[in-house]
């Protein structure tokens, strides 16, 4: 993942609420999927393995944030684990079909979380962060 993209994710995370945070985590997953594809196309097997591990770490973060007191969390857990297994299969078979399957599932979930995030009017999670306006920062 490029440094500029990392900075963008950091900025977005510093200003998001809880609903937006999940969307940003999904965006990070998709950035790693792009890294997987790029490494595969260039024949960089080690880079591909690293990108797959990074994508799996994002899935681990999503799994860790599940609240199992809600029934939907059990379904999300199964989907996230399936995606992790597909990424593992892609790593060991050196093919992209498992990556594509995981990306497809995650994209369908992503569209739902985007809609939920639009309805979330809660306050930002981080306090005392700088506000960014068109590339300029202003202290609160």
Across the structure, where does each feature detected by a protein language model lie?
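Short, solvent-exposed segments of well-ordered alpha helices
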Residues: 13-23, 46, 70, 74
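Membrane-helix exit/interface motif
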Residues: 37-40, 62-67, 91
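Short, solvent-exposed, charged loop/turn and helix-capping segments
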Residues: 58-76
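Amphipathic, charged alpha-helical scaffolds that flank and support histidine-based chemistry
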Residues: 87-103
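Long, amphipathic, charge-rich alpha-helical segments that form helical bundles/coiled-coils
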Residues: 73-90
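Solenoid-repeat scaffolds in large eukaryotic assemblies
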Residues: 48, 55, 99-102
